[in-house]
Regions:
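Short S/T/G/P-rich N-terminal loop/turn motif that feeds into the first structured element of a domain
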Residues: 1-67, 71-88
Length: 90
């Protein structure tokens, strides 16, 4: 198993657009071998003193944090999928 994780700032007003894009991308990833894709929206992200999710992505006021991950059977499948997705015109 190989897991890729992502932390993304998304303007609150763009949530529906993000979900549409993530759904489309999720289908493409699944077509190339991803076994699970999770999009988790911020509900209770605390501000840290040294670092936190907001600082990690330089989130602006009005942006929500999305923590997502993709599970692949192995790194080789993820690497091959990345190359194919870069050529996929969907």
């Amino acid at each position: 198993m190989y897991i890729q994780g992502f932390v993304i700032p998304v303007p609150e007003g763009n949530k529906d657009k993000y979900i549409d894009a993530a759904t489309s991308m999720g289908q493409i990833m699944a077509d190339y071998g991803a076994t699970e894709i999770v999009e988790a929206w911020e509900e209770d992200v605390k501000d840290g003193k040294t670092t936190d999710f907001r600082m990690a992505v330089k989130a602006e006021p009005g942006e929500k944090i999305v923590f997502s991950w993709v599970i692949w059977p192995d790194k080789a499948t993820a690497d091959a999928a990345h190359d194919k997705m870069m050529q996929d015109e969907r």
